[in-house]
From Swiss-Prot:
Annotated localization: Cell membrane
Organism: Methanococcus maripaludis (strain DSM 14266 / JCM 13030 / NBRC 101832 / S2 / LL)
One MF annotation (Gene Ontology) recorded for this entry: proton-transporting ATPase activity, rotational mechanism
Xref: PANTHER family: ATPASE H+-TRANSPORTING V1 SUBUNIT E1A-RELATED (PTHR45715)
Protein family (similarity comment): Belongs to the V-ATPase E subunit family.
A biological process from GO: proton motive force-driven plasma membrane ATP synthesis
Gene symbol of the encoding locus: atpE
Main location: membrane
Alphabetical UniProt keywords: ATP synthesis, Cell membrane, Hydrogen ion transport, Ion transport, Membrane, Transport
UniProt-recorded name of the protein: A-type ATP synthase subunit E
Domain of life where this protein originates: Archaea
InterPro entries noted in UniProt: ATPase_E_C (IPR038495), ATPase_V1_Esu (IPR002842)
Amino acid sequence: MGAEKITSKIVEDANKNAEKILAEALNEKEAILTEAKEEASKKEQAIAKKGEKDAEMTKNRILAEARLSAKKKLLEEREKTIQLTLEKLEEDLVKLPQKEDYKDILLKLIISGVYSVGGGELELLLNKKDFELIDDSTLWALEKEMEDRLKKVTVLKKGEAKSIIGGCIIKTADQTKVSDNSLEATFERNLDSVRAKIAEMLF
């Protein structure tokens, strides 16, 4: 729930920057091919006296090398684009707790974490600032909602403040089950799908 919203939101925010980088890469590819065609044409004329067959072979070799070089360059720029986009996503991730809808995202991550461990007596771990967002009345409402959904008594007790960007960590009282829905852990778990989504959007 919350994880999908996070990844979709920050990928969308980074899209414009990545498209610009890709456009530059495509322009460079065209420049490589154009230069190669000009070089091939010049060499073809220079060796024309040696025979038409030799000239054609030289031209084809130059063009093949140019296409290979252009393809390699495009692949390098594609990976560069993905890496730069991921860096932008990480920057946006740090800023996410400052956004107006962050509390809604946090609540969804908490609910997802409670589902993951199956309810019951739980410990809720947040960073210091997020503990201020989740007051006692909000905590009580969450407990009631989860009890109704899981058909199981659920108690959320605030634990110690953690050094995380945002999101939450949910633990069962006996420590046997842990759901790490911190923003950084959520991002890391979804990294492969984020990369695939970036590639799909841009290429």
